Amino acid sequence: MCIRDRLRTPAVWVLAAASAFMYISRYAINGWGVLFLQEAKGFSDVEAISVVSINALLGILGTVLSGWFSDKLFKGDRKIPALLFGILNSVALALFLYGGNAMWVNVLSMVLFGIAIGVLICFLGGLMAVDIVPRKATGAALGVVGIASYIAAGIQDVASGWLIDSHITVATDGAKHYDFGPVALFWIAASVISFLLPLMNRKQKTEA
């Protein structure tokens, strides 16, 4: 089977879609997390930036540990840790969005979110793609997943901006009040879809 035929297999595109939805949640926090903390929770600029930056630092740890998680704890099975860290991603995002204003809660949410995203980037964007295609097709498969992910990140930015802007109310004194409810549901839904989609590849890989 040629590379083109391999890339036509549903498993590659399911994985690309899963990674794309994961990137929506990832860049939602990186792009809009500071504004959310400022407007929804009353954090100062320094506080908001400091909290959101934690997830990037912990993402490095998640990336470093991702191979160890799958190889040592799960004997090379990527699906189980991808599911577990996908759920952790959604839980951390929900904690960030709905967990209240306490500093420690928001710091904890970004610690968990960063670790989860770091692991998922390696799994959905790399290791799982390598697992489902022959070695000669891995570059093409990674390219498909990467392109889908960054297209989704761009769409997220536009969609999130529209959802946020369309739910701003202006008081008589000119003060703006943000309703992050709709965009928060969009981000949560994307994170949930991202960990459900790879489950569809179980049967397909068995038949390959």
How should these model regions be labeled?
Residues 96-98, 183-208:
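Multi-pass alpha-helical transporter architecture, strongest
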